[in-house]
Amino acid sequence: MNKEFIKSIVVSSPWEKVEIARHKDRPTGKYYIDNIFKDFIEFHGDRLFGDDKAIIGGIASFEDISVTVIAITKGANTNENIERNFGMPNPEGYRKALRLMKQAEKFNRPVICFIDTPGAFCGVGAEERGQGSAIANNLFELSRLKTPIISIVIGEGGSGGALALTVADKILMLENAVYSILSPEGFASILWKDSKRVKEAANVMKITAQDLNEFGIIDTVIKEPRGGAHKNPQKQVTLIKKEIMNAMNEMKNIETNQMINERYDKFRKIGTLE
C-alpha cells in the first residue's frame, strides 16, 4: 500500500486534522443545509447595515420539526469563496444570526448552527461597524435564549468568530474538525515567534474533537467517512442527521428555565480544575 493512499485514509495527528478541516473539497455549511433540511427559506440582512453572505440563515423542516438553521459557510469554489469572504463573517452576519435566533425564540423553534470559519473578519470596515460588540452581544443573548440551541463544528472553529454561534446546549463536532482560540500558525507566531512550528502548536493546543470532548467542552464527536467528510459527503449527511436527532430527543422534555440554567453551568465549568 503506497504512502499517499495510507495518508488518505488514516488521519491521526492534530495537524493532519487541521489539514482535513481546511480541505478545499470539504462539504460546506450550505451543502449540509441543502441536504439535511427540507423547505429551507433563507432570510437576509441584519436590519442595520446589510446582508453578509458568509452566514446563511433561515427556517426549514427537520424530520417534520420546524427549525431555524444558521451556517457560517465557506465556498465550494474560488468564486463562491470570494463571495462568502472565505467563511469570515462581518458584524452584520452575526447580527443577522442573532435576529434569526430571537425570531426562533418567539416561535419556539429549535436553533441548529453549523460552524466553519477561520475566524471573524478583521478588516477596517468590520471593526468600524462593531465586530467586537456584535460577537459579545451574541454571546450574551445566546446564553439566555429560551429555545434549544444545537451547534455543530463541521470544519474550522476559529476564535470568537466561531464562539458567537456555539454558546449552545449541545455542541457537536465532526471528528476531523478543529475548534480553538486561534490557528496553529497564529499560536506558533505569537508564542514562539516561529510560524514553521505549526505541527508542534497543533499538538499542544488541544484543538481536536477528541481532546475537547475529553475536557467537556463539546458533547459529541460525530464520526466521518474514512479519509474525511469530503470522501463521502452523503454518508456524512446521514451521520450528522442521526446526531442532531439524538440531541433534539435529549432536550425535548427539558423545561425552559432548567435548560437555560444547564447551559449557563456548562460554560461556567469550562476551564475549571478538579
From Swiss-Prot:
GO terms for cellular component: acetyl-CoA carboxylase complex. It catalyses: N(6)-carboxybiotinyl-L-lysyl-[protein] + acetyl-CoA = N(6)-biotinyl-L-lysyl-[protein] + malonyl-CoA. Its main location: cytoplasm. One of its GO terms (molecular function) is carboxyl- or carbamoyltransferase activity. It comes from the Bacteria. PANTHER family: ACETYL-COENZYME A CARBOXYLASE CARBOXYL TRANSFERASE SUBUNIT ALPHA, ACETYL-COENZYME A CARBOXYLASE CARBOXYL TRANSFERASE SUBUNIT ALPHA, CHLOROPLASTIC. This is Acetyl-coenzyme A carboxylase carboxyl transferase subunit alpha. It comes from Clostridium botulinum (strain Alaska E43 / Type E3).
